[in-house]
Structure formats: structure tokens, C-alpha cells
């Protein structure tokens, strides 16, 4: 198979191809990230409609950007993040995530050390799909346990997900993601 990525810098005339495509489609130029971010924040405000939002934050790009966006849109008093240490990351990575988020000014992020639970459930499991299911189920179990421990009333709190659309497809569509 062949893949072609006109968006990367080393593609000859990639920008020109995009420009021609946009011209053919009659697309109006003028899009900018600032306007898009504001549109997303307005959408978040409408969907949250006075409720608070809870989000699992891995420290990766997707969930970190979602956490930042939620905080900007709703304010930190209406957003709570939870980082789950699953014991499967690099040494001290969870501490690094928490330190980074603190440096960025986020005081509304908690951590749950569930490493022993994850590792005990994965012990002796060799098949990748079984591991994936166990990890996913354990994240859900820890999330449920932590939301109960934190006293998050489902009538007052929404659950947000920081992911990109292709990940929802990979995990079987939006039903399982």
C-alpha cells in the first residue's frame, strides 16, 4: 500500500495541493485556531449547562488539552481532573504529570494510585486483547470508586473524555470509548 501525506513539510507542493483543493471546493479561507477554540468553549458551556465536569487526565496531549479547554470554558471551580497511576507507565511518570500540571496552574487535578490493582489483575495474562479489556475495565472500576469517594453526584457532574475521534473508532465506536 501507499500513503500520501501532503500536509507534511517534505511533501513537494503539498500546500499548493491543499490550496487547489480548497479553491475547487469553493472553501472560504480565514479559519484560525483562536476562533475554533472559542467555538469549542462555547459548545462546552452549552453542553455543561451549569453542571460540573469530571475528566480522567493521563498526561497525554488529548486529555491535557481537553482539561485545559474545560478549565478555560467553565473555570476550575466546575472542573475536576483525575490522574490514575496504573503502574504501567515509566518510573515516576505520574509524579511528572502531576508536577507539570501544577506548574501550569492546575490545582483541580487529583491522583489515584491504582498500580497494585492494575498489576494484580494483569498478572498471568498474556493475550493482548485480554490485557486491553482488563485495563479498560479497571480504569472504569477505579473511576467509579474515585467518583464515589469524592462524592461526585451524577446529577451535578458530567463525565468528559479527552480523546480524538480516530481513537473512538479504534475502540469500537463511541459506544465503547
Question: Which stretches of residues belong to each language-model region?
Answer:
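RNA-binding accessory domains that recognize and position tRNA/RNA substrates
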Residues: 1-157, 163-177
Amino acid at each position: 500500500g501507499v500513503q500520501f501525506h501532503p500536509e507534511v513539510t517534505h511533501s513537494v507542493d503539498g500546500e499548493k495541493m491543499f490550496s487547489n483543493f480548497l479553491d475547487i471546493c469553493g472553501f472560504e479561507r480565514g479559519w484560525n485556531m483562536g476562533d475554533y477554540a472559542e467555538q469549542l468553549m462555547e459548545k462546552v458551556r452549552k453542553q455543561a449547562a451549569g453542571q460540573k465536569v469530571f475528566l480522567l487526565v493521563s498526561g497525554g496531549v488529548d486529555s491535557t488539552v481537553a482539561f485545559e479547554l474545560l478549565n478555560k470554558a467553565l473555570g476550575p471551580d466546575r472542573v475536576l481532573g483525575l490522574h490514575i497511576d496504573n503502574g504501567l507507565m515509566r518510573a515516576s511518570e505520574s509524579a511528572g504529570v502531576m508536577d507539570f500540571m501544577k506548574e501550569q496552574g492546575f490545582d483541580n487535578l487529583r491522583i489515584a494510585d491504582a498500580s497494585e490493582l492494575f498489576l494484580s489483575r494483569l498478572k498471568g495474562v498474556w493475550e493482548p486483547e485480554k490485557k486491553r479489556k482488563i485495563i479498560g475495565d479497571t480504569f472504569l472500576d477505579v473511576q467509579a470508586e474515585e467518583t464515589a469517594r469524592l462524592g461526585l453526584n451524577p446529577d451535578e457532574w458530567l463525565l468528559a473524555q479527552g480523546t480524538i475521534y480516530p481513537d473512538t473508532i479504534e475502540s469500537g465506536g463511541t459506544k465503547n470509548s
